[in-house]
Amino acid sequence: MLSPEAGRLRPEYTERIGNTMSRKDLQQTIEQEPLRPGLEANLSRIKEIGGGTSDLLINPVRVSGIPCVLLCCEGMLSTATITELVLHPLMKLHLPDATGPRLLEHINDEMLLSVDRPVPLTFGDVFRTINSGFAVLLADGANHALAFGVQGYDKRGIDEPSSEGNVMGAHEGFTEVVRTNMSLIRRRMKSPVLVQQLFVMGEKSRTDLCLCYMSDRVSPRLLEQIRQDLEHMQLETILSSGYVRPFLERRDWRIFHTTGTTERPDVLCSKLLEGRVALLIDGTPFAIFLPKLFVENFQTLDDYTCKPYYAVFVRWIKYLAFFLALLLPGIYTAIALHHPELLNSTLLQLLTEAEANAPFSLMTESIGVLLMYEVIREAGIRLPKAVGGAVSIVAGLIIGDAAVSSGFISTPLLTVTALSVTTGFVIPELSHEITVFRFLFILCGGLWGLFGISLLGMVMLLNLCATEAYGYPITAPLAPFAPRAMRDVLTRIGLRRMQTGNPRRHPTKHAWRLCTVSAGIFSAISHRNSLQYASIPASFLCNLSKNLLAHLPHKPCGMPPALWRNCMNKIRSGQLFAICFLIRSFSLLCTDIPFSAVQLGGAVLSATLQGLILLPILLTAGIEPSKPASCLFGAFFLLWGGHCFLQLWGVAAGVTFPVHNKLFGALLLTGVCLYGVQLGIHALARSASLLLPLFGVALAVLLLGAWSKAQPENLYAAAGGSLLSAAWKDLCECGWLPGAAYLCRFTPFRPRRAVYGALLAQLGATVLVSLLGIAVLGRVGAQVEFPFFTLGAFSQPFATQRADAIYVVLFTLIGTITIAVQLYLAGACIARLFPKFPYPFYAGGAGTLLVAWGMHSLGLLHSGLFGVWILLLCGILPVGQQLWGQLRKRRMA
């Protein structure tokens, strides 16, 4: 038991510290205090600083008649090595007319006693070398010392990694000694371009860290940023890799890690070959590498030691396991409580009978079962291995069997929980994220059904898409999309095809470089031997920073720095097209029009009229927007955001919706949209590009379920009214105007034909896809009682009673992106008009809700006509401004 005096300083330091310096100042003084010429003075000072520590060995010796002292730390060096390599040669040394400085100089220059021979100059250097396993020689009359590297402390041998098992790979793992780990890497990578730099971190622990990289492949910018982060890291002690990772990940709001850890030397060598940077830390067997992509959580070493078809099968199993582990309990709770129509009658009856005798609600029951599992798992981990496994098995069997037998827990719920927990073991790198968000999905599913699960899923997706590691998005190569790198993401091609051609152009191992989206420099890094193929053509990129936010101060008041940095970036044309397509799809999903040949012709005519309206905006997109134009654009985006809210809740009125209070549901949706806005335009753009294929697959499944019940002649049936009336109605719906206006706002001021061509191509593709959807799928929409694709009472793709909840998920995901885009642009217009306003985006969200409430109160459900006039004015104003400027110049002339 420690005494009350255990944590206090020694008495000889109390007065000095209390009068002149703090503990930190004392540490700095010791580090900087130089050695003295007298041996007795140095020895007494060392004893004073050491405070009588028992493991400091002081051995007085005489070398060539000079009084010397050999200092070492017990247990940190090899006794046989120091006796044979240091003491015996020193005892045999006879140097005539020897002095202390000359003796140390002769030993250092003429005698090879050890390979590593640092020269301590201060008392801090002496203690640092002694504690690192060196033997330090002090000589009388010398104001410096000489150290010999004779380390020989006990260490764990090289063993098989415990956290990363494999079948056909190597069975060597890192140890706790950094120099041993360096040798494991060097033995596999004998290239001269492999650089391993040692440095010391930690004010108290003085831990050795090793920075590893391939000098011909690493990005100089990435390497410099990592070095700066390590230099700014102020830690007293470093005991594991978990101490360093937060400083390399920079932000705490990220859900997923941007740095990876591995216990395997072969895995780390493959990362170094990809141009990554690795960090070895003394005292831990886990090496850090960065940056890390999200898809790497589903890749293992065994994927490259088996046939490609089996690797693809296993990889898809991992993707499926991730979604099951994360979503299965929440979806089960949501369906059982809010969407029982998704189940067929037999399954619904079984679940009803199982839950009939349960004393708690299903949400409480689900959370209780998961909490019980987490307690048992934690107990099994913390207990000794001989007892932990037995305790886990016994506790699981006894508690689980007793709970089911007594009726506290239903059998289906226990089955769902066991399946979710088991699938979570397939992806151990994501175990922490899965564990926490599994509970959150249960809460959201129990409170708001699949609507709540969709909102929480959007929060995770937006956070994932906004996460970058030193400018590299971790969602690459999915967003931004890189076709070459996709060959080893969802599939896995053969190794012969991977290594065909230039080995530096590895399709997947360099996916993070192919998809570089540097923070502020999109063309990124063009190094002579690294990342020269990562440059992305800039002709198809649309610049946001030089448009609406052109005259904002460098860092607007109230605008988060992350948002400002994202505003100054560029987004890719494919992501822009995904946003426009989802906006158009949302408008089409919510359109309550009986589609027919007349309606198809009306849509074509309406698209032509809208193109004429947008023509002035396209022609004047390179002109700096004036404040009146920004005000009109802001009004349009607020109006359209409110209209999207009304469309969403109009759809909700026709399907089974778990949130009955529209205002509360709108507040939830607005909160998620504002979160996406705060993360920046890149988060929205990447999320849209990831949602687009998901939306296509879901829509195909739903339409296949309804296709057999549709009559093809409905497409040619008259819907009532003339072609002009159909065009007028479609024009009032403002079909693709939001996407077109959004494209125009991202046009750079410096006009480029390639940029205008990309804009027109995206507009044409969006309109063409929409019209083809009407023409091909219109026969399905002609028979439904709800809006076009809302086939809740019509489609039964999985033999369900009704499929309303699936449409709720689709509408929520697409509606979140659509409304978030409008809020972002409305907030940007507000920031343009009022640069000193602290919360422009929150004002945009509140304004959108007020507009939606006002339109609902006034019955203005089709407000697109107002948007037409506003956009028309937005095109006329710059033209008038330009003409007025030319007239003034002529008058001045």
Question: At which residue positions do the language-model features occur?
Answer:
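Generic detector of multi-pass transmembrane helix bundles and their immediately adjacent loops
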Residues: I331, L347, P359-S523
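Membrane-water interface regions at transmembrane-helix termini and the short interhelical loops
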Residues: P594-F595, I617-I623, Q647-A653, T670-L691, ...
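Extracellular loop-to-transmembrane helix junctions
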Residues: P4, F123, S587-L619, F866-P878, ...
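Membrane-interface interhelical connector segments
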Residues: L337-E355, V776-D804
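Hydrophobic transmembrane alpha-helices that form the core helical bundles
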Residues: G622-P658, Q678, T812-F834
